[in-house]
Amino acid sequence: MVGLTGGIASGKSTIANFFSDLNVPIIDTDLIARDILGTKSPALIEIRTTFGDAVICADGSLDRNAMREIIFAEERKRQLLENILHPRIQKEAYQQIAQSIGPYVIVVVPLLYESSMKEAMDRILVVDCQEETQLQRLIERDNETIEQARLIIDAQASRADRLSIADDIIDNEGSIIRNK
């Protein structure tokens, strides 16, 4: 089992897609998180109970922008959300790992440094880039303000922390084609 991690907007999904193109099984915990947050799901009901109707859209789905503003403004609220989501995400990830076929599987875990899942990995692959590159990508990709982008980056493990758990590193500072 290979844990693939990196900071937000570092290029984890792009690198995971390269492996997927080579028929390597990929389990993406961000996708699992989206799946478990379906309308009327137990996780979404617990989030609504904990954070209130302000984080729920008119159609009953999670208002990701409202949730993001809350959790990146206050550490305690981010911890509350993680306590709701992380056990569910990990349970589903381990179920998918057990069902995967092949000599190895890549498990994409953005917050691997902060997660107990790192202990289960045989190797850890960190997708790395400079913080300024992350900021630029995050602002362009998600239309974030520089202030909001910095809050998001600052809420995650530091680059040095991520690199400290790496068995292997992909420098994703340059072009996508170079990494492929």
Model-predicted regions and their roles:
Residues 101, 119-120, 140-180:
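Small-molecule kinase domains that catalyze NTP-dependent phosphoryl transfer to phosphate-bearing small molecules
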Residues 31-103:
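ATP-dependent small-molecule kinase phosphotransfer cores
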Residues 25, 31, 123, 167-168:
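Well-ordered beta-strand positions
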Residues 31-34, 129-132, 154, 176:
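Short, acidic/turn-prone active-site loops that include or flank metal/cofactor-
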Residues 11, 30, 81, 106, ...:
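Residue-level signal for inorganic ion chemistry
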